[in-house]
Amino acid sequence: MDFSELSVECLLTKLVELGFDQTREERSCKYTDRDFVQLGCQRVLGSFQSGRDFLQHQHEVEQTKIARSTFFKALQSSRRLQVCEDVSRGILKVLNEQMDTLEVDYLKQFSALNEYEVYAGDGHFIEHACHTKLIDSKKEQRRTGKLPKLHAAGLIYMQNLRNGLLSLFAPVSDGTRKNHEMPIFRNHYEKFKAQTNKRVIYVLDRAYVDKVWWSRKMGPNVDFISRSKSNFSLTMCGDMGFDDNKEINQGVKRDFLAGLGGNSAAFRFIDYKDPETGNTYQFYTSNMDLEPGLIAWLYFKRWTIEKTYDTSKNSLCEQKAWATGEGALQVQAHFICVVYNILRFINEITLKSMDEDEKISYRKKYADWIKKREEKAIKKGRSINLLLKNSLRMPKIAIQFIRFLKNNFHSPLPLRRLLPILRLRLINYVVF
């Protein structure tokens, strides 16, 4: 199906319809599940200050009257949560196939990664819902030794580093309690892993260090990449050979195996010195096959998910939980994933439609930035990592691009007719 022949609103409607093919939880209600998902995505696109603001807009502008209690009870419904999870996964499946059709693969130059799915993962925290209540103070004081307080609401997301599509991994906290991310990751790992048959590499920060658990999970189908902690006690097991003449291994100083403390499993450690800044890093991983420089590069590409969080928080204005409870927080997260993935898909369609001159203009700003960095490094007697110039870069979705799609959500024009303006929004920053 050619999605570019649909308007933005019809594209969302069609993808939601395809997503519902993946769920068995849909029921016939006055406030239908399809309306719930559709309106939830529209709220993400609308930059509303609150749920009441959104409902008033629906009533006065869209001529759709929804009772406040109906909307907020739907957000907290466990059945509707399952519907949203199934639909989000179904839409993700459709968009993965569409990305393959568009030949979107930001890791394609690294043939060693062809057999892997590579995910960047991290926690993302926003303000808790305004009606979030403190949990029982005496019980919590006995548990932690201090009086309870409200915290940020947070979730763990995973982003596919091949095509940029985002998916919810697990909730961390609705704000009533501060939780560490690694126990949450351990509890939901098997469920997420079951979604793919390929080998998986998780690129995670140091919040996900757990030498005992990872040593049990080390195997042919799953690997992780992270950074070492300063308190690691290493038991040397021997060096691994690598070719320091390869471009990919620029900056690698050492590649070796070591045990952690009393753990019998040996992990791979890579000492890396950034040729541009001189900063040193030590990465550790369970993968024994990839070039050490590629391990380091994948960790640096983890920053992609931080740019995605910036898009969610500042471009889509999703800075606060919609309702109390982890269930409502997950529903909101699924809506954010659906909207972000559709924006990413339209972004790739727009890039694909550019002619050569437009592609050169689009890449010029990044090329000029890299050139300035290179000149600055040369003055200091250093150099930049060649992969900065020679590898594919997953762009952050431009704010003017998102604003244009928001403003034209109800436009009857097909996406194909909007592409000329969308290309301009990517190439030039227009001052209004």
Task: Locate predicted features.
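Short amphipathic alpha-helical "interface-anchor" segments enriched in bulky aromatics
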Residues: 295-323
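A short, flexible helix-boundary coil/loop motif
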Residues: 1-22, 27-30, 241-272, 314, ...
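Short, conserved catalytic/metal-binding motifs centered on acidic residues
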Residues: 39, 54, 66-72, 116-126, ...
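Basic, amphipathic alpha-helical segments enriched in Lys/Arg and hydrophobic/aromatic residues
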Residues: 323-348
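Dynamic "connector" segments at or just before major functional cores
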Residues: 1-52, 62, 85, 89-102, ...
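Active-site-proximal, Lys/Arg-enriched surface segment
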Residues: 75-161
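An internal, acidic/charged active-site-proximal segment
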Residues: 169-279
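A conserved active-site cap/scaffold subdomain adjacent to cofactor or substrate pockets
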Residues: 274, 278-305
